[in-house]
Design a protein with these regions (language model features):
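Glycosyltransferase catalytic domains, chiefly GT-A lineage
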Residues: 1-293
Length: 293
């Protein structure tokens, strides 16, 4: 597929058979509804996508303790090939034709389908009634912000929900954004915050001076299971219309396995976690004051 430096691509991270299968399903959606658009996939097994003409698959080895922050590598690869990239979770679906020039890539910076300023994100913490998980997330994010001389409670800093967002080049600010995200990813993971990467995305963008804005992402009709449940609850969608997408995702993401297979997978996951955590601790010793004081 031709790579247009002035155009855009979709991109995702798909490691492990379950997510490779889901990404392949998404690739077929993109081929159908956005036929001239490349889909950049970072994956542990590029050969799984060799028969999918719209996919540009690149070998990826897990870098984060858990995979959440590795999304930045998919974005970096997309931006090395195109002017804009739209990150989309591998377990999502595209449901209708996508415009050749989506509005979400028309402005430099980050345009997210879901984002909110940090005071709103942590309103329960600031009001004094958070749950334990949110409080831990707030404490780690606040310390991370202070390391970059930022104030987490600043209304101009946004938490970015990472399932669907576009990044358009902005005179090199996008490169600094990715650099700061890497720093923040390590800090958050060292402090036990492996997910909620929207904190790192928002703080990194603020530090780099990269604009962040919300958008309804007009022209990108999508399925995301947890979003769809909310739509159904609000009467904006019907379960009978979306049932096939729920069924396909469940079948691929949670396939039936023998108990022996489950034990092996769980053991391998634990070993990888411990290895990646040890690796992170060793690598961050080179900047001891930043990460450990």
């Amino acid at each position: 597929m031709n790579q247009d430096k002035k155009g855009f691509c979709f991109c995702t991270l798909a490691c492990g058979k379950n997510y490779r299968d889901l990404a392949l399903l998404l690739a077929k959606d993109i081929e159908k509804y956005s036929p001239n658009t490349s889909f950049v996939i970072l994956t542990d097994c590029p050969s799984d996508f060799s028969q999918q003409p719209n996919v540009l698959a690149f070998k990826h080895r897990q870098q984060s303790v858990k995979f959440y922050h590795d999304k930045r590598f998919a974005i970096a690869k997309g931006l090395s090939l195109f002017n804009s990239c739209i990150f989309i979770d591998a377990d999502m679906r595209i449901l209708a034709p996508v415009p050749q020039n989506p509005k979400c890539i028309s402005m430099p910076g980050i345009t997210a389908r879901g984002c909110e300023n940090m005071p709103k994100k942590y309103a329960k913490v600031l009001a004094g009634n958070p749950d334990a998980k949110l409080l831990k997330e707030f404490k780690v994010a606040k310390k991370a912000a202070s390391k970059l001389n930022l104030e987490l409670e600043n209304e101009d800093i946004n938490f970015v929900y990472e399932y669907l967002f576009a990044v358009t080049k902005d005179s090199g600010k996008e490169i600094e954004f990715l650099k700061q995200w890497e720093i923040l990813a390590s800090y958050c993971e060292l402090n036990g915050l492996y997910d909620s990467e929207g904190n790192a995305i928002g703080l990194a963008a603020a530090k780099a001076g990269l604009p962040v804005r919300w958008s309804a992402m007009e022209g990108i009709s999508f399925f995301k299971n947890r979003i769809e449940f909310v739509r159904i609850k609000k009467g904006e969608s019907k379960m009978e219309d979306m049932a096939i997408y729920f069924e396909q995702q469940t079948k691929l993401e949670y396939p039936e396995r023998f108990i022996g297979q489950r034990i092996i997978l769980k053991s391998n996951k634990l070993i990888k976690y411990l290895y990646n955590l040890l690796r992170l601790r060793i690598l961050t010793l080179k900047d001891f004051d930043f990460y450990y004081r």
